[in-house]
From Swiss-Prot:
One of its GO terms (cellular component) is cytoplasm. PANTHER family: ENDORIBONUCLEASE YBEY, CHLOROPLASTIC (PTHR46986:SF1). Single strand-specific metallo-endoribonuclease involved in late-stage 70S ribosome quality control and in maturation of the 3' terminus of the 16S rRNA. Binds 1 zinc ion. The gene is ybeY. Keywords: Cytoplasm, Endonuclease, Hydrolase, Metal-binding, Nuclease, Ribosome biogenesis, rRNA processing, Zinc. It holds the Pfam family YbeY. This is Endoribonuclease YbeY. One of its GO terms (molecular function) is zinc ion binding. It comes from the Bacteria. It comes from Escherichia coli O7:K1 (strain IAI39 / ExPEC).
Length: 155
């Protein structure tokens, strides 16, 4: 049976009201075992300041962002199950959910699904890549019992 090992790091000034570790685990399990037998993923939930700093350092964008994905590149000749790290910004996720009229839990789930697909090598820079990635995200979100996260864009 496929297994995803989760290292959850809650690094917000106030960690109350965040999803439970079991929810993060469920969301990861909905994505990664489809592609990989065994994996280890770190999810770090942060405040805007840390997200801003990381986004500026690694993407050159001077603002916080919802989710950053840092895939782990296994050195040649080594076998490791470490897939990578997701850094999710609490304030951005909460603000986006409110602005987009989405249930907060569903938006958290979407950020984990979206970030996990990035760790697995999916991207959305080119239109065809974006369509493939969004279709996978939608399929996974529906399987989890949530709405299509892109439904507003399709209407």
């Amino acid at each position: 049976m496929s297994q995803v090992i989760l290292d959850l790091q809650l690094a917000c000034e106030d960690n109350s009201g965040l999803p439970e570790e079991s929810q993060f685990q469920t969301w990861l399990n909905a994505v990664i075992p489809q592609f990989q037998e065994e994996s280890e993923v770190t999810i770090r939930v942060v405040d805007s300041a840390e997200s801003h700093c990381l986004n500026l350092t690694y993407r050159g964008k001077d603002k916080p962002t919802n989710v950053l994905s840092f895939p782990f590149e296994v050195p040649p000749g080594m076998e490791m199950s470490l897939l990578g790290d997701l850094v999710i910004c609490r304030q951005v996720v909460e603000k986006e959910a409110q602005e987009q009229g989405k249930p907060l839990e569903a938006h958290w789930a979407h950020m984990v699904v979206h970030g996990s697909l990035h760790l697995l090598g999916y991207d959305h820079i080119e239109d065809d890549e974006a369509e493939e990635m969004e279709a996978l995200e939608t399929e996974i979100m529906l399987a989890l019992g949530y709405e299509d996260p892109y439904i507003a864009e399709k209407e």
